[in-house]
């Protein structure tokens, strides 16, 4: 067996976990391994802080070694054996280094505490700088303390003064920087609002709306220059700016589009250059640079010129029954007969002569700001259409191009259908339609207001809708009598005001179309007010218990009305003794007749045919009532008094 070569066998435990117990059936119960925190707590429990540090033990061991060096050789051999055992002996306390560091830190903290207590409490020790010169023998220690305090206060005061000087310098420098803004910072602010590019040694900007879809040929270029008109050695004004812009001469000043509607058209020979500039020049906003206001005004002038150029081009191209007239900076159109629409470009430059000419030719302000605002909206919509004319292909694999080109194929449109799809109204046509609608709406409102102020009975009320369109508005017209609003609700009209006509919708759904003439609307409203009186008598008769014998909105008897037709109604009392006949016309007015019983008529001649007394209960002829002498605030109130007087007493 001794000659057999040794074989190394690695023995490993079958289970790393310790076995707690083994059951009768052979099952083993294991102990769960300790977690990191539990293992750390177990090791900390083994530390004995009562023992000395390792450094002290080493020093003691070193002293013993020195003592043993003086001993014999036998003792030195034993010592080497013991040192060998110590070298291979593992450390029993793994946290010895932590304990040593904590003890050294505690020692240093104690020393620091002692030093601070000595410095704070002068009873222990006084710290003074070392002086080279010997102190005089008669100098008092209190004098030295006073001198040291003065020196320390002087040093602190010097530090505070230096800090105050630095703060004042920084504040003054910031104020000077605000006043003396450099060219580069202003150029950076300018680039944040406007498009700039460098061409050679010049910096050019763009005022046009080409990026928004404008096709106006004006270049709209301005140049950025450095302001050198001020002497920097002198006092700099507050509004000084080192940057200035130079715009084209035709874009200087301010401009706006003046749109007005006049009833009488002047002679064509009197038309000329319109100079009706009344608006003040735009003022710069507080905090904004002057070049911003200057560029905004120039861009507004460019936009107004583009609008007027587009309108002039369309005025020449559009074929209408009454041709449009373009004279210098004015466009004349006639939307309705005896009505003139004037669109003028008013441009005021910064010359001194322009205010004088403006004051000489001032006229009453009839400018329609709504149409001017709509012109700006329309030109922006035109720009948007120009940008979106090239649409993305659907599907994505199709080539780029216009939509009508992609629709060609088996289901392609013919030429007429494509023209109908592509046909769109121009800027001038849209603004003329809006002007027609505005004029028709104002004429309708004036007609209703004039009737309401002129006629007190019946009352006419107009409720305008807040939600309108640029081409259509609606107003609800109510005709009522004062004090009888609950029973007199028969006349309710809805007026839909369009571009060239007015649609009237009655309460029962009937629709009547009126033209743009104001007299036609006035006649219609007068006839409706006349019918209202008859309808009010009908509703009052139902409330009073009278019987309606006849009713007609269009009476064919009597005088012919020049406006509409007359209405009539006949009602009888509850017992049938009395009858009231009412005839009301838009022009002739109201006529009321009362029929009495025969036995109350003294003027009737005796008849030889009607001898029986029963015929006396029949009603006699009608007698007209002097309506002007009746008491009452309105027509319905007078009619109520008349019916009450003729009704039988039930007591």
UniProtKB/Swiss-Prot annotation:
GO biological process, one term: regulation of transcription by RNA polymerase II
Record keywords, A-Z: Activator, Nucleus, Transcription, Transcription regulation
Low complexity bias spans: 62-74
InterPro entries associated with the record: Mediator_Med17 (IPR019313)
GO CC annotations, alphabetized: core mediator complex; mediator complex
One Pfam family linked to the record: Med17
Subcellular location(s) per record: Nucleus
Region (Disordered): 51-83
Molecular functions (GO terms): nuclear thyroid hormone receptor binding; transcription coactivator activity; transcription coregulator activity
Similarity comment text for this entry: Belongs to the Mediator complex subunit 17 family.
Subunit structure: Component of the Mediator complex, which is composed of MED1, MED4, MED6, MED7, MED8, MED9, MED10, MED11, MED12, MED13, MED13L, MED14, MED15, MED16, MED17, MED18, MED19, MED20, MED21, MED22, MED23, MED24, MED25, MED26, MED27, MED29, MED30, MED31, CCNC, CDK8 and CDC2L6/CDK11. The MED12, MED13, CCNC and CDK8 subunits form a distinct module termed the CDK8 module. Mediator containing the CDK8 module is less active than Mediator lacking this module in supporting transcriptional activation.
Task performed by this protein: Component of the Mediator complex, a coactivator involved in the regulated transcription of nearly all RNA polymerase II-dependent genes. Mediator functions as a bridge to convey information from gene-specific regulatory proteins to the basal RNA polymerase II transcription machinery. Mediator is recruited to promoters by direct interactions with regulatory proteins and serves as a scaffold for the assembly of a functional preinitiation complex with RNA polymerase II and the general transcription factors.
Entry protein name: Mediator of RNA polymerase II transcription subunit 17
Source organism of the structure: Bos taurus
């Amino acid at each position: 067996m001794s000659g057999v070569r040794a074989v190394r066998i690695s023995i490993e435990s079958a289970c790393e976990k310790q076995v707690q117990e083994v059951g009768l059936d052979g099952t083993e119960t294991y102990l769960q391994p300790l977690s990191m925190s539990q293992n750390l707590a177990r090791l900390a429990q083994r530390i004995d802080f009562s023992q000395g540090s390792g450094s002290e033990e080493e020093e003691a061991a070193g002293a013993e070694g020195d003592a043993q060096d003086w001993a014999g050789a036998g003792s030195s051999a034993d010592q080497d054996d013991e040192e060998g055992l110590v070298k291979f002996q593992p450390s029993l306390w793994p946290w010895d280094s932590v304990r040593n560091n904590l003890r050294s830190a505690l020692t240093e903290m104690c020393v620091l505490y002692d030093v601070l207590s000595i410095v704070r409490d002068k009873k222990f020790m006084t710290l003074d700088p070392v002086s080279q010169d010997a102190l005089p023998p008669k100098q008092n220690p209190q004098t030295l303390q006073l001198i040291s305090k003065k020196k320390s206060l002087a040093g602190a005061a010097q530090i505070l003064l230096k800090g105050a000087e630095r703060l004042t310098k920084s504040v003054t420098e910031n104020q000077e920087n605000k006043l003396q803004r450099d060219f580069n910072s202003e150029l950076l602010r300018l680039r944040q609002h406007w498009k700039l590019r460098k061409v050679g040694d010049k910096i050019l900007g763009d005022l046009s709306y080409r990026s928004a879809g404008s096709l106006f040929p004006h270049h709209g270029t301005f140049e950025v220059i450095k302001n050198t008109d001020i002497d920097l050695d002198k006092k700099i004004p507050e509004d000084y700016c080192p940057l200035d812009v130079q715009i084209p001469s035709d874009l200087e000043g301010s401009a706006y589009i003046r749109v007005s509607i006049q009833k009488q058209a002047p002679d064509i020979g009197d038309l000329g250059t319109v100079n009706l500039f009344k608006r003040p020049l735009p003022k710069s906003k507080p905090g904004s640079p002057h070049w911003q206001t200057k560029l905004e005004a120039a861009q507004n002038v460019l936009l107004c010129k583009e609008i007027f150029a587009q309108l002039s081009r369309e005025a020449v191209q559009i074929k209408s029954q009454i041709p449009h007239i373009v004279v210098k900076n004015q466009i004349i159109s006639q939307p309705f007969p005896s009505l003139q629409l004037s669109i003028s470009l008013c441009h005021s430059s910064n010359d001194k002569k322009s205010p004088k000419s403006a004051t000489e030719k001032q006229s009453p302000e009839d400018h329609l700001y709504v149409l001017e605002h709509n012109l700006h909206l329309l030109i922006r919509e035109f720009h948007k259409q120009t940008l979106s004319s090239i649409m993305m292909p659907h599907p994505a694999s199709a080539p780029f191009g216009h939509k009508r080109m992609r629709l060609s194929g088996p289901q392609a449109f013919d030429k007429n259908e494509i023209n109908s799809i592509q046909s769109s109204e121009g800027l001038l046509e849209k603004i003329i339609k809006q002007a027609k609608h505005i004029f028709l709406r104002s004429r309708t409102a004036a007609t209703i207001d004039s009737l309401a102020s002129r006629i007190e009975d019946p009352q006419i009320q107009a409720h305008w809708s807040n939600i309108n369109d640029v081409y259509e508005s609606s107003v609800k017209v109510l005709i009522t009598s004062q004090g009888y609003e609950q029973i007199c609700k028969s006349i309710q009209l809805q007026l839909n005001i369009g571009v060239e006509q007015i649609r009237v919708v009655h309460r029962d759904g009937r629709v009547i179309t009126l033209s743009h003439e104001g007299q036609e609307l006035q006649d219609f409203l007068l006839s409706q007010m006349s019918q209202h009186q008859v309808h009010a008598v009908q509703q009052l008769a139902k409330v009073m218990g009278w019987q309606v014998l006849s009713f007609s909105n269009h009476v064919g008897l009597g005088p012919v009305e020049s406006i509409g037709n007359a209405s009539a109604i006949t009602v009888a009392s509850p017992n049938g003794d009395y009858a009231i006949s009412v005839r009301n016309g838009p022009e002739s007015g109201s006529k009321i007749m009362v029929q009495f019983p025969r036995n109350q008529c003294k003027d009737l001649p005796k008849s030889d045919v009607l001898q029986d007394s029963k015929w006396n209960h029949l009603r006699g002829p009608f007698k007209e009532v002097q309506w002007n002498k009746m008491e009452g605030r309105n027509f319905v109130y007078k009619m109520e008094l008349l019916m009450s007087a003729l009704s039988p007493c039930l007591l």
